[in-house]
Design a protein with these regions (language model features):
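HDAC/HDAC-like amidohydrolase catalytic core signature
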Residues: 1-287
Length: 287
């Protein structure tokens, strides 16, 4: 198991904001203490500006250095452009590791799946998974799927990949919930699985299984996973019902696809996040 992380991603914070450095630091500590899963630690690779511009406008890239909040959820931080690029570099490094047959997880912040071509929003500044998916397509992968199990709809990823013939997007998320999108399938390649608040755990898992089966029918050559852990039953930002065992099962299910796969951290705001990530990684690794 390869974990990609960087101290820079714990260098910024905002008082009272749920997307905080401890999400990373406490998970690192948990993963370093455990002995069941051998881990190789590495740093992000370089961030390719051309890769960013496949997914985002130059206006957004320029906007990242202007000292003005994007919205109340997405404040400006000094050097946020550098931190966002480090997350992109980790996503691109994860893609390369998956191509080489490794099981890999990017333990980085900021997350990315709400960022659209022209807008940073929802704690997200650049869309890491969309950038990596388009990079894969640009470098010879014929079909790329993005599987997003964050409890919030990946509106940014959907908008960037919409109607791209080489890509498919699958999002399983709570609705109603932020950002208020994802109620139906969109275009020819974006498939949404909205789940009502407080859906019973078994029903939620059934929806996840249906989405995995649908993804398999697309026959991708690469899968990028937006791994959000906020559908957890005790996450403060939603009303999900999943437990650690369900994230383990989901990791197993994705592993069983038998397709090169990379996972990038998105949401998850409970103090139990390290346990949830470890459970998912064990499933991915077949432990």
């Amino acid at each position: 198991m390869r974990i990609i992380t960087d101290e820079r991603c714990t260098s910024y914070s905002h008082p009272g904001h749920p997307e905080r450095p401890e999400r990373i630091s406490s998970t690192r500590e948990k993963l370093r203490r455990q002995t069941e899963l051998p881990i190789d630690w590495s740093n992000p690779g370089p961030c390719d500006e051309a890769a960013i511009l496949r997914a985002h406008s130059s206006d957004l890239v320029t906007r990242l250095i202007r000292s003005e909040d994007f919205d109340t959820d997405t404040p400006f931080f000094p050097n946020i452009a550098d931190y966002a690029r480090a997350s992109v570099g980790a996503a691109l490094e994860a893609l390369q590791a998956a191509r080489a047959g490794e099981t890999v997880f990017s333990l980085m912040r900021p997350p990315g799946h709400h960022a659209t071509r022209n807008r940073a929003m929802g704690f997200c500044y650049l869309n890491n998974v969309a950038i990596a998916a388009l990079e894969a397509l640009a470098n010879g992968t014929r079909r790329v799927a993005v599987f997003d199990f964050d409890v919030h709809h990946g509106n940014g990823t959907e908008s960037i990949l919409l109607n791209n013939p080489g890509a498919a997007f699958f999002s399983i998320h709570q609705f109603p919930c932020y950002p208020g999108t994802g109620t139906r399938n969109v275009g020819a390649n974006c498939f949404n699985y909205p789940v009502p608040p407080q859906t019973l755990r078994g029903e939620y898992r059934h929806v996840l299984a249906s989405a995995v089966e649908h993804l398999q029918s697309f026959k991708p050559g690469m899968v990028g996973v937006s791994a959000g852990f906020d559908a957890y039953a005790r996450d403060p930002l939603a009303q999900g019902s999943l437990e650690a065992e369900d994230f383990y099962w989901l990791g197993q299910s994705l592993r069983n696809l038998g397709v090169p796969l990379f996972s990038l951290l998105e949401g998850g705001y409970s103090p139990d996040l390290p346990d949830l990530i470890l459970a998912y990684l064990k499933g991915l690794a077949g432990k």
